């Protein structure tokens, strides 16, 4: 369960990073 939560966090962070890069 912990690993799944970590993977979800990584996915969310990657999505945020992509959105930030798009803004720039």
UniProtKB/Swiss-Prot annotation:
GO terms for cellular component: cytoplasm; extracellular region. It is found in: Secreted; Cytoplasm. InterPro entries: Humanin. Highly expressed in testis. Also expressed in kidney, heart, skeletal muscles and brain. Keywords: Cytoplasm, Secreted. GO terms for molecular function: receptor antagonist activity. One of its GO terms (biological process) is negative regulation of execution phase of apoptosis. The keyword Transcription regulation does not apply. Pfam families: Humanin. Induction: Down-regulated 6 hours following staurosporine (STS) treatment and up-regulated 24 hours following STS treatment. Down-regulated 6 hours following beta-carotene treatment, while it is up-regulated 24 hours following beta-carotene treatment. Transmembrane segments: none annotated. Plays a role as a neuroprotective and antiapoptotic factor. Belongs to the humanin family. This is Humanin-like 3. It comes from Homo sapiens. The lineage of its organism: Eukaryota, Metazoa, Chordata, Craniata, Vertebrata. The gene is MTRNR2L3.
């Amino acid at each position: 369960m912990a690993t799944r939560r970590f993977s979800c966090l990584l996915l969310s962070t990657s999505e945020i990073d992509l959105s930030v890069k798009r803004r720039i």
